[in-house]
Amino acid sequence: NPVALAAGIETMKILKKENPYPRLAKFAKKIADAMNSKSEKKSQKVHCVNEGGMFTIFFTDKKPLRNSDDIKCCDTAKFAEFFRKMLKKGYYLPPSQFETAFISAVHTEKSIEKFIMDAWL
């Protein structure tokens, strides 16, 4: 499809020119750091991990999470409750705690701050 090919080429040009990846990683780290900090202060069983522009929120007191066995012990019912709460607030997160959320190039410092405030349990 020539239209899809043209769109892909233009997308690659924009990504090369603007290089949003460091900003995406900074935002994902900001979310993880905020969630983990608040979790520790409130003694909540929440652990957020990030890599690049991705993050995942786990409901567990096990830290660090090193493998799939650690992750399987997380509270999926609590995550489902969190997912529904965030969906009502207009955030579409992955519906499973075994998937990751992605920061996009359209997210701003303000939208990340709002997410952190809205996400706090």
Name each region found by the language model.
Residues 1-121:
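Conserved N-terminal phosphate-binding loop of PLP-dependent enzymes in the Aspartate aminotransferase
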